[in-house]
Amino acid sequence: MKDKLQQLRSKIDELDTKLVRLLNERTKLVLEIGKIKHASGDEIYAPDREDAVLRRIVEKGDGPLPADSLRAIYREIMSASLALEKPLVIAYLGPEATYSHMAVIKKFGSSLKHEPLPSITDVFTEVSKGRADYGVEPIENSTEGAVTHTYDMFVDSELKICAQIVLQIRHNLMAACPREAVKRLYSIPQVFAQCRQWLQVNMPHAELVETSSSTRAAQIVKTEPNAGALASSLAAEMYGLTILDANIQDSSENVTRFLVIGRKYPPRTGNDKTSLMFSVQDRVGALHDSIASFKKFKINMTKIESRPSKKKAWEYYFFVDCLGHCDDGRVKKALGELAKHTMFVKILGSYPNVNG
């Protein structure tokens, strides 16, 4: 039995040696591509190419590694390669170990520089001024609805949406003490609300203390006795806390969608989504006529959100997501028709319609 075990381990060692050699060969090719991109002025990060690579890898996989594991492995490979091509800076709404941070890692891996910032406005500003290459912003949550501040920032910004990230939100009870010793729980109001039923059943007598972020809750709990935090698994890992109960949110469909913002949006992939905004005149049927443009050219409109313009009373901007790329023929025709019925149309970006 021991001989068999040693043989298998030796085989794994041989495969690991081959993997390292192949990874280095792959990286050399990536660096050559980076030189070509740099010479032509192309963006180093290409969401369309990333999507194609991940889809191909998943299609080639025949087990036993599941698709999610293959994506995670190749995400880190691509992250390390990107870091060698150019030390990209990814700005996000901080602090560290929040779900925004987890979204950054899911999309960009852990080899690039992640820059936590205090506000959504700061993320837009850093990318606009070139101090960050890309920004990651929350746009909507399946239980809490739209993140209106992100929508508002697009009104005057020239930045474009170049990718999206869909992240399952999984809240966890963590502490530095046994579960039965926990008397106080720290977190933000939204997390307490999303775990209300679980708390009533499992910790009805615990004192709930609100903090500025779930990360701050984990920081407090690291040193405070008899305290627990409701936060992300990344927070537990970062602050050395034990997860006492995992996935304690009341809804299993708690999902947040994030947008990646940059200076350009990628070319079409054949499976894309377009985000845009427009404004209509104050007349009967104006919005109906505008939306009919999508139906006329058989474009699936997947979301519409309205926001006050803040420039004139009762004037609104409408934000729309639709399937297809703005360079697709039918989408172009629909946008042309839309322009006839609106005061203005602004394309916010076209990007791969994947969960990131």
Where are these regions (language model features)?
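Domain-level signature for soluble enzymes in the chorismate/prephenate branch of the shikimate pathway
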Residues: M1-G356
